[in-house]
Amino acid sequence: MKVAVVGATGLVGTRMLEVLAERNFPVTELLPVASAKSVGRKITFQGKEWTVVSAEDAIAARPDLALFSAGGSTSAELAPKFAEVGCRVVDNSSHWRMDPTKKLVVPEVNGDVIEADDYIIANPNCSTIQMLLPLWPLHKAYTIKRVVVSTYQSVTGTGYKAMDQMTAERAGGKWGEYDAVYPHPIDQNILPHIDSFLETGYTKEEMKMVNETHKIFGDDSIGVSPTTVRVPVQGGHSESINLEFEKEFTLEDVRKMMEETPGVTLQDDPANNVYPMPLYAWGKNDVFVGRIRRDPSVKSGLNFWCVADNLRKGAATNAVQIAEKLIEKGFLPKE
């Protein structure tokens, strides 16, 4: 299969290449696409060197699949051009997510919604993906009335420049002496501010979690109240999740569901200091769930903690899994 990776030299793009290789995705020809300054560079994939090409050259090569992680404006401009030549596009930006004509997919949750005429498919927000994967079996069993979620999001979600800012601060750099992508220092700090603020007081990141939950679950009645926070870690995103159900549940059944849910790993033995942590989620594809306990303030309430590598399941892995679903449905060649 001829595969283009748009944004191949970025944080998520490099993870996409890693995941394609690790999962033995049937790539016979790779078209790494990046900005003009990177065209001509060599990258290594599956032991072979490939040359970074322009988007125009990649489109002319008529790939079967294009994985996009190059920002919303790039996706808005280029995704339709790839689709016009018969290429299936999986886009990691926010541009297409709430477009009513485009599918927003977490394969383990709603992969079956993909149809033959879906040439541009949206990858959800990283924090939404890791929340909804464990929520889906719980919603099917007990019907979620309300979700209250607070996120603790890695600087890797912002990209290389955010990592550089944190590194400079940890080396003793003073504010104003280094390039900063955040409005305040991030090292030894926490910023309750991801993306821009809206008139409601919520941020765009928070509203992504609300709107994407409704679209993926196909249920606008679920109450979602998020607070998204940037923290000075690199391993992945963490979330404190509080749920209120329509139906009663047992903790034993909840734990069993988490053990049996594909893509979820249960780490819930706090007496022995076993619980999910971003340091140990780094580089892994699963969503890790623990600290499962009742919320005593409501009749059918549940609290838990979940962690995932935002560059993996929160982005690259989910995108490749969507492509695998396209193969499974016969919409992409098997080789």
Task: Go through each PLM region and give its residues.
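Charged docking surfaces used in two-component/phosphorelay signaling
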Residues: 66, 155-335
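N-terminal Rossmann-like NAD(P) cofactor-binding subdomain of oxidoreductases
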Residues: 1-186, 221-223, 287-288, 292-297, ...
